[in-house]
Amino acid sequence: MMDFAFKDLKVWHKAVEFADNAISLSENLDTDRKHYRLVEQLESASASVSMNIAEGKGRNSKKEFIQYLFIARGSLYETVTLAVIFNKRQWISDKDLEKLETEAIEIASMIKGLINSIYKTL
């Protein structure tokens, strides 16, 4: 049976957990269904972090992997921005925002470390 190399990455596991937490948070939002597109975007952007890490790991070169890690980081920042907007609209609590931001900071640091370690091997 084939093993997927991205499953060996701790950052991928953290990103999957981050997406699960963000999606769980979005399921409890009370937006009167007026802003469904924003809620959907939060779910999509949060899932995109782990998806881009996995896709990049499956690419042919280290440079391509780095590019996908940058895309993953962009999706992470997008998710945090949406969470800040949701907090301003009082759709999520300060505590929920802080939890997401704390997870995002850890993941961003891990992505940066992975990028730097790959650069050293080029």
Predicted regions and their residues:
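Amphipathic alpha-helical assembly/interaction segments
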Residues: M1-L122
